[in-house]
Amino acid sequence: MSKSFYGYIRDAWKNPDETYVRDLRWERLQVWRKEGSVTRVERPTRIDRARSLGYKAKQGIVVARVKVRRGSMRKSRYIRGRRTQHTGKNKITVGKSIQRISEERAARKYPNMEVLNSYWVGEDGKQKWYEVILVDPSHPVIKSDKNLNWICGKAHSGRVFRGKTSAGRKGRGMQTRGTGTEKTRPSVRSNLNRSKK
């Protein structure tokens, strides 16, 4: 059976350092570094990945490329006339993944849209880039799309801020079932509060 066009793109992105993606990325990152934190793009960089996550080239769907710093939290050293014994600064990390942070930043940039999903497109020593797929739930084209109109319901309002996207569910431990996950459902916080009642 012959491989499709998307199949060749998918194979190239599996090992981006060994294929033609390496040269493309070298050129793209020079342009992306000069852009802002959230930039709307005309079409997805990885069309195969975008389509597998629900992207369609139609009205009401937007793709935004988000630039986020790599590493820990970048906490600043405060000067308040004293020295605390346990100044948390260097090894403090955020409880969210960088991909989840990028989704939330895109959602704040476009408050009338909901985040459908996101995927990695590049990184260097300082930053990571993700492309976020956003959907307008009030657009008539989206409302009439049987594959996407579920996002128009009130239950999916602000879904990215409640950890309902794929990256959010992964960070909450929802991808795993069985032994060792007894305290993850419905959430770590609500499971902790069960003993206080």
Swiss-Prot record:
Q: Where is the composition biased (Basic residues)?
A: 163-172
Q: Which GO terms describe its cellular component?
A: cytosolic large ribosomal subunit
> What is a single Pfam family found in this protein's UniProt entry?
Ribosomal_L15e
Q: List compositional bias (Polar residues) regions by residue number.
A: 186-197
What the entry lists under SUPFAM superfamilies is as follows: Ribosomal proteins S24e, L23 and L15e
Region (Disordered) residue ranges read: 163-197
Which Gene Ontology BP annotations are present? cytoplasmic translation
Query: Which domain of life, per UniProt?
Result: Archaea
Q: Which InterPro entries match?
A: Rbsml_eL15_core_dom_sf, Ribosomal_eL15, Ribosomal_eL15_arc, Ribosomal_uL23/eL15/eS24_sf
Entry GO MF terms: RNA binding; structural constituent of ribosome
Q: Which UniProt keywords apply?
A: Ribonucleoprotein, Ribosomal protein
Q: Which family does it belong to?
A: Belongs to the eukaryotic ribosomal protein eL15 family.
| Protein known as | Large ribosomal subunit protein eL15
Species, as recorded: Methanococcoides burtonii (strain DSM 6242 / NBRC 107633 / OCM 468 / ACE-M)
Name the lineage.
Answer: Archaea, Methanobacteriati, Methanobacteriota, Stenosarchaea group, Methanomicrobia
Gene of this entry: rpl15e
